[in-house]
Amino acid sequence: MELVTMHTHTNYTGHGHGTVAELVNAAAATGISAIAVTEHYPMSEAMDPTNEVSMPWDKMPQYLIDIAAAAAAHPAMDVLPGCEVDWLGAQEDRDFSALDFSNFVHVLGSVHYLDGWAFDDPAQEARWHDVGVDAVWRRYFEVWCEAASCREAPFTCMAHPDLVKKFGYRPSFNPQPLYDQAAEAVVAGGHMVEVNTSGLTYACAELFPAPDLLRTFFCAGIPCTIG
């Protein structure tokens, strides 16, 4: 069985750990045959003033150099240059048409912000109770579908599709209609989706996506990768 991991982070942001070399060395030691290094693509100072959750713009050249060096050090592995691009919706202040993503083989699209609110940040979890679980779920899938259906975005794959369940909050309604909309959006955008194992470590204690959502993607013929 081939082992791959297509969603990884490093110390190029404040919430990651280890260098690119350390990451790839560890992957090689566990028998992984393909890895994508997918640090969060830079955001503006207005969105991430301390680069806690995104890479500084001036670190991008060295980041790509480090990935190339790791690939050269492990010729038996596929070491892919990648990044994770946060979909910011109306708060987006980057012009993707003016940015060059040609150096990246694997570009993850993700939704960590709802109208400027980092809904999955433990420091901002209290707002869930103000907004309401059902409303957050509906808004999340609305924004996620906007991202997934956008052909102008640089994404090759949509990451952790139902990240909204991270804290274990579940809606009072059947989410299947939202799942159907998510699958339709991915098909419209021409993207892949990711099966992300990190959900097993959070309160939701479940892969992203949930089995029913993954089944919906499968039935729609959407290709998947693993991160």
Which role fits each region the language model picked out?
Residues 40, 222-227:
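Short acidic/histidine-rich active-site segments
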Residues 90-95, 118-122:
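Short, conserved acidic/polar surface loops in the N-terminal third of protein domains
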Residues 102-104, 110-220:
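Domain-core and long-helix interface of multi-subunit machines
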Residues 1-89, 99, 165-169, 173-177, ...:
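An N-terminally biased module of ancient metal coordination in phosphate/nucleic-acid-related enzymes
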Residues 5-6, 105, 226:
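Short hydrophobic beta-strand that contains or immediately precedes a catalytic carboxylate
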Residues 46-47, 91, 204-205, 224:
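Short Asp/Glu-rich motifs
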